[in-house]
Structure formats: C-alpha cells, structure tokens
C-alpha cells in the first residue's frame, strides 16, 4: 500500500507492506487523516513512534472498514474514525477495533478524520485526569488549535465557562464564536488573563515561559495539565505557590498509552461525547483540507501556527 513517510524533514508517498489484520483488529480503507503537531515533530525526526508502532505518519484517520479480524463486532462497510499510534496517512491501516468509533451523525467522512485525537485528548486530560466539575472555570492555551476547538465545545456542552489565549484577534473571535467566554492575544499582555481567573483547570500545550503565569492563574486546588512543550521544556517556578494553592501539575501523553487504556478511553467517548454530535452540540472544525499530493503544503499550513481548527489530508476522496 502507499503511505506517507517523513524522510529527512520531507514527506514521501512510498510503498509499504500491507499489514496483517489479526484478532480484534479491523482494516480501514482510509479516506482522510487529521494532522497533529506530533506529525510535524516526527517528520522532523524529533518524535519517533512508540516501540512497535508504524513508522508511517498519522495519529488519526477516517474511512471504511474493509476487513474484520476475529472477535471484533465491526462490519465490513462500516464508516468509522480511529485513533492510532501511527500509520493513518496511508491507503489503508490496521487498528485495534476498540480504538474505533462510528462516524457521528451529521458528520462527513472527511470531517470525521479531525475528531479522534482531539476529543480523546480533551476528554482524557480535562474530564478524566483533571476531573473537571460542573461550573469550574477552564483556561485553554492555544485555544484556536484543534484541541482547543474541541475543548471549547466540550466545556460549553458540560456547563463549564472557558477562556483562551491565542495568537491573533481573528483567532480570539473564532474561539468566542465556538463558545469561549473571552481571552487574550498572546502578543498583548498575557497577565491580563488574571482578570478572568483564577482557573480551576488549565490545559497547557505550551509550557516554557507560560509555566510561571499558570501558577499565578491557578485557583486553590487547581489542576494544571501539561500536554505539550511548544514554548520550550524549561521553566522557572515559584514552588511556594504550588504549596500555598495546593496546585496539581499533571503531565500527560496519549500516543504511548497501552491498548487497554485507549480502549477504555474510547468506551467513555462513545458514551459521553459521541452522542453530542447528533444533538448538534459538537461539530468538527476544519481549517483546511489538502489532497495527499499536497502533503508538504498541509504540513506547512499546520506549522504556520495561523490556522483555526484542524488541517486534514484527504487520502481517497472517492470514499466520501
């Protein structure tokens, strides 16, 4: 099968062996794959896949099931989207059937490629790990990102007011239209976020020099969940604030989690999140789609840090 590899900072559409479909797995003919920052890092040689995972780029995809392994309840022809440790940017992918969800009602097959990674990330980190309670206030750094877009909608759906930090006035307006209460543009004074706080939960893909600010913004017994290091891996912290406020600093990753952990997470998504699409309370937010032949342009678009929502790579538009 053809698949997208990251080679010396470039992407190449190359031939790869077709993976076997074993017990409990399904084979998906891929329609589209969502781009994530991990793909940028892997392409640059900075983020290798976990042991045993495919070297092919792509942590999420959508498509049509073409083969079902023994023990799986899926059917050939089912339209689905899936969370992957790698391999999504290919003509087909084999995945644990428990890491697959149906394309939600009212969502196209191409749009569905933008859902698994961001909604799994937000549900895991905000609702499970940080144990967000009704009415608690949330701060989302990089609020116009794919993860931010999902988090804003979930906060609104579950009755939690949220605020954002973003890169431009246009992206702030985008977040407010999705349901954010407000926020700040990072080129302005980030300290002004204190006017909206303190915050019970902070979802932080930035780290770096945002760390000291987060401690100032965190409420008593607040939870600061670190999911990325776009701003750097080093920070200077006033540990007295951690003690005084009883702050929980929670580091979190998803890609390297084991199969059972992801299966349990997807069971929760199926029960608590996926029905909200049919109710019109959640919707995919696509910034732009690119055909696979323009993969370099798609990666450049994501790397520009100017998009609002998700960038999606279309692998086979005949399936849609």
Regions found by a protein language model. Give the residues of each.
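Glycine-rich phosphate-binding loop and adjacent beta-alpha segment
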Residues: 158, 166, 209-281, 314-320
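Glycine-rich beta-strand-centered segment in the early N-terminal region that forms part
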Residues: 18-34, 46-87
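C-terminal capping/lid region of NAD(P)-dependent oxidoreductase domains
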Residues: 1, 279-285, 296-320
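Glycine-rich NAD(P) Rossmann-fold beta1-alpha1 loop
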Residues: 119-120, 145-149, 208
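NAD(P)H dinucleotide-binding glycine-rich loop of Rossmann-like/cofactor-binding domains
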Residues: 41, 79-142
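Short, glycine/polar-rich helix-capping loops at beta-to-alpha or helix-loop-helix junctions
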Residues: 88-91, 166-174, 234-239
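Adenosine-nucleotide cofactor-binding segment
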Residues: 140, 156-210, 262-264
């Amino acid at each position: 099968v053809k698949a997208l590899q990251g080679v010396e900072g470039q992407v190449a559409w190359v031939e790869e062996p077709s993976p076997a479909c074993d017990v409990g797995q399904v084979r998906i003919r891929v329609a589209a794959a969502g781009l994530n920052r991990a793909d940028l890092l892997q392409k640059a040689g900075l983020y290798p896949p976990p042991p045993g995972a495919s070297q092919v780029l792509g942590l999420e995809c959508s498509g049509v099931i073409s083969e079902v392994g023994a023990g799986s309840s899926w059917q050939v022809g089912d339209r689905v989207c899936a969370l992957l440790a790698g391999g999504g940017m290919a003509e087909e992918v084999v995945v644990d059937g428990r890491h697959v969800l149906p394309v939600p009602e009212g969502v196209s097959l191409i749009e569905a490629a933008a859902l698994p990674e961001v909604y799994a990330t937000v549900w895991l980190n905000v609702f499970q790990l940080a144990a967000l309670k009704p009415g608690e206030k949330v701060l989302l750094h990089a609020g116009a990102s794919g993860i931010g877009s999902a988090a804003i909608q979930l906060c609104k759906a579950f009755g939690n007011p949220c605020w954002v930090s973003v890169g431009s006035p246009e992206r702030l307006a985008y977040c407010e239209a999705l349901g954010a209460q407000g926020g700040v543009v990072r080129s302005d004074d980030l300290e002004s976020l204190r006017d909206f706080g303190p915050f019970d939960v902070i979802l932080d893909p930035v780290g770096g020099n945002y760390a000291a600010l987060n401690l100032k913004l965190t409420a008593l017994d607040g939870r600061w969940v670190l999911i990325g290091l776009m701003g750097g891996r080093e920070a200077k912290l006033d540990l007295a604030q951690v003690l005084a406020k009883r702050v929980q600093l929670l580091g979190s990753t998803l890609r390297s989690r084991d199969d059972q952990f992801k299966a349990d997470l997807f069971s929760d998504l199926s029960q608590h999140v996926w029905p909200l699409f049919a109710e019109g309370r959640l919707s995919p937010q696509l910034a732009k789609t690119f055909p696979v032949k323009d993969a370099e342009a798609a990666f450049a678009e994501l790397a520009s840090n100017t998009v609002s929502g998700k960038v999606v790579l279309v692998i086979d538009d005949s399936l849609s």
